[in-house]
Every structure is written in C-alpha cells, then in structure tokens.
Regions:
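Canonical radical SAM enzyme core domain
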Residues: 5-18
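Auxiliary Fe-S-binding modules of radical SAM enzymes
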Residues: 17, 21-126
Length: 126
C-alpha cells in the first residue's frame, strides 16, 4: 500500500490519522510512502497555482509522515522515499517504529528544509 500526501495542508492531520487506521485494518505486508512532487503540466500543479490545492512544505510533509507512522499499527515492511528517512526502511515496522518516529522528529527540528525543497524542485521524473 502506498501513502502519498494528497490531502494538502487543510486536511493533512485527518488524512494521516485516517489513512493509518485504514492501512492498519488492511494488514498489508508492505507500506510505502512517497513525497508529493508537483510536476509541470500536471493537473495538480495547475490546481495549486490557482489556489485550489494547498501542497505541504517539506517540514509539513515530515510532520504528516510522523503522524502517519505514529498511528500505523500494522507489522509490515516499511519503505519511505522521503529524503531524510531512506535509512529507516525495512521489515518489522513495529519493532522499529520508535526509532522511525525519533528520526522524523529530529529531521523536523533540525533538517535542512531548503535543501530538501531544492531536491524536490529539481526532480524531473518519478
């Protein structure tokens, strides 16, 4: 199952909590997360430019991911494609959950958000 930040800023919290509940009920073998990058020529970027979609900042994406992880109760393999958390992927999610939350919390407090945003802006493809 894949988790993506599609609810935007206005629904971020409820999206993270409710998605974690649904994911946990499904008991997936694998949960993956990917950051949301708005590419030129896509409808979602056009919606953001018109003010109809409010994408998250890098810090807000990390905060949403942390909230999702805190609420996820499925013992699965966990893979994240976020820049700061690549070393947190692997099996046995529940035994590593506290470590993942701590790493995300550290990134939220001390991460170089400008560098992360620049990395995302420079992406040309998935």
């Amino acid at each position: 199952m894949e988790y993506i930040y599609l609810a935007g800023r206005s629904h971020s919290r409820e999206h993270a909590v409710n998605s974690a509940k649904i994911f946990s009920q499904c008991k997936p073998m694998l949960v993956g997360t990917g950051g949301l990058t708005l590419f030129p020529g896509t409808p979602l970027l056009e919606e953001a430019q018109r003010g109809e979609f409010d994408p998250l900042t890098e810090k807000e994406m990390l905060e949403e991911l942390k909230l999702f992880v805190e609420n996820l109760t499925a013992d699965c393999s966990f893979i994240t494609h976020h820049t700061v958390a690549a070393n947190l992927t692997g099996p046995n999610f529940l035994s590593r959950k506290d470590k993942i939350v701590a790493a995300l919390d550290h990134a939220i407090r001390h991460g170089d958000m400008d560098r992360m945003a620049a990395y995302r802006r420079n992406k040309r493809t998935l």
